[in-house]
Amino acid sequence: MVPDKYRGGRCLTMRASGESGDNLSPIAPVEFESPVGQLLAQILRTHPHLLPAAVDQQLDNLQSDKNDQTEETPQSQDLLYKRIAEVKEKERQKTLEEIIYCLIVQKFVDNEISMIPKVTETSDPTGRVDFWPNQEQKLEFVHSPEAFEMIQSHLSLVLGDRMVGPLSTIVQISKIKLGKLYAASIMYGYFLRRVDQRFQLERTMKTLPEDFTKSQARFEDPNPGKQLWDPDSLIRIPPHDDDDGRGYGDAEGKQYRLRSYVMYLDSETLQRYATIRSKEAISLIEKQTQALFGRPDIQILDDGSLDTSNDEVVSLTFSGLTMLVLEAVAFGSFLWDAESYVESKYHFLKS
């Protein structure tokens, strides 16, 4: 099911304060490096309504370039030709990555959501770094009601008891842990969009299994002492203790819950849905995370253990931490949409 969500869009041009002329502040933390990426980023800033056509044109160019290279392949490849082919393939991959990233950024722009900038030290007396706006409602609306219900459970898992405390309470956390939490939440958003699309399609086609609401969670509740943003714990779907069985009904009055649907799926299907499909997507998750939190300063000691003593600790509120998680989940959902759209125009996913 290919998302058709890249048509039109409102203009959200962000000019750096105190500057004049055509200098525009970055609308995303990752810098575009390829000529195609820089062109698309400029179009997104100044003429966002032209971006869909520009993306399609660039994907056509990539396909033509790939076809031309295939036709030019000699019967006996020498080392020089192989090297040239490898360089061209890397250039295509970088271009493809930045096309996907630009489509992700466009989704944030269309929903009037400002992406969180690089997390850096501030002059605030408390050391707070989370002075970005509260956009929880906007980030909620990019998901279906059923999906956001599961996102709230994800927040409860990764934040734990912090969810019940004042949102203005300041906590200290290392950048490495923040990066792990952010990257894991991207992967959760990717999985959630993928499985939600299947759920919504089956519900529309009235092909949902009759007994799927009777299934139980296959996973044990997470160990309270475990770091809950470990990717291994992300696809746990524990039932709520106060679950009243209410779901989202159809025209016939039948009640369905995405949570119950996920628990109904077999482990092989769950694993497949939780797997990132392309190396380009994996690379973008890494780049987005490092653009926000920097490259982790980790050293391997002689005994094989990891030394993270140089890891920087930052302060932020529970509200800011919540915004980080919600943005990451939205990023993952948009990543699935963008990857699927690009695949519909330029086949690059492995079967």
PLM region spans:
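N-terminal chloroplast transit peptides
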Residues: 1-26
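Long compositionally biased, domain-poor regions of proteins
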Residues: 17-351
